[in-house]
Every structure is written in C-alpha cells, then in structure tokens.
Design a protein with these regions (language model features):
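Short histidine-centered loop motifs in beta-beta connectors
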Residues: 1-25
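Structural recognition of the beta-strand scaffold that forms the well-ordered cores
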Residues: 1-5, 29-30, 51-53
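A mature extracytoplasmic/lumenal domain signature
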Residues: 5-8, 35, 54-56
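Generic alpha-helical propensity signal that fires on short helical segments
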Residues: 9-11, 19, 40, 46, ...
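Extracytoplasmic/secreted cell-surface and envelope-processing proteins
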Residues: 12-13, 37-39, 61-63
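Glycine-rich loops and low-complexity Gly/Arg-rich segments
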Residues: 15-18, 26-29, 53-55, 77-80
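Short hydrophobic beta/alpha edge segments that flank linear recognition/processing sites
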Residues: 22-40
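Acidic, glycine-rich catalytic/binding loops that coordinate metals and/or anionic ligands
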Residues: 42-114
Length: 114
C-alpha cells in the first residue's frame, strides 16, 4: 500500500509502527497536503486529501522502474467508503480512534490505535 499527501509532522496515528497489526476501521494516518516539492506544502495542493495506491512487488529491483504493477483501487475504495467506521477525536492529543470496537470470533478487536 502507498499513502501520500499525509499530514505534516504527525502523519501517522500515535504509537503506530511498521509491522503493527491493525483492524478494519482503525485510524492509521491523517490526510494532509504534503507531497513532492522542495518546500513542504508548496506543491500546489490546496485541499487536504489522501493519495492511495496499491503496488504489486514480486522483485524489489522492479520498484521505481518501468516495470511497476499498480492496481486500480477504485472498486476497493468504493467498498471501504460504504463500510466506514465512525471515529472520535481526542481534543487534547488531536488523535482519532474508532468509536466502536468490534468482535471477531468472540474476541474484542481494538487494533493498534483503539
């Protein structure tokens, strides 16, 4: 997965690190206006948004080449949009978490952020 244009300075949910397990609905990052430019937030992006991509990598040498395989995530995002989880904001920390926890096989799922 590829996420771009995240929030400046604190793009990811607090305490989230590579390799953590997350559950559907967990907040993992925050939309922003960052991007490819020499100076942060001066790339012509005026609205905060998320650039989401999914790349298949079978061989690390294929990354950043003309042989990249990118998946059209339009159908995936449609399903996600129809099944959003409500979140709440902690005004003190400015972090968001999933409002409702859920059960999987009678085990309470809290994920990395909730």
């Amino acid at each position: 997965w590829y996420y771009a244009h995240l929030r400046q300075n604190r793009p990811f949910a607090e305490n989230l690190k590579e390799g953590d397990k997350v559950c559907a609905g967990d907040v993992i990052g925050y939309v922003g206006r960052t991007g490819y430019s020499d100076t942060e937030n001066t790339n012509g992006i005026t609205e905060s948004h998320l650039h989401l991509g999914l790349e298949l990598v079978f061989d690390e040498s294929q990354k950043e080449s003309n042989n990249e395989i990118w998946i059209d995530v339009g159908a995936i995002t449609s399903v996600i949009e129809q099944n959003q989880s409500e979140v709440v904001r902690n005004n003190e920390t400015k972090e968001f978490t999933r409002k409702y926890k859920f059960l999987v096989n009678n085990d309470l799922q809290t994920g990395a952020t909730g």
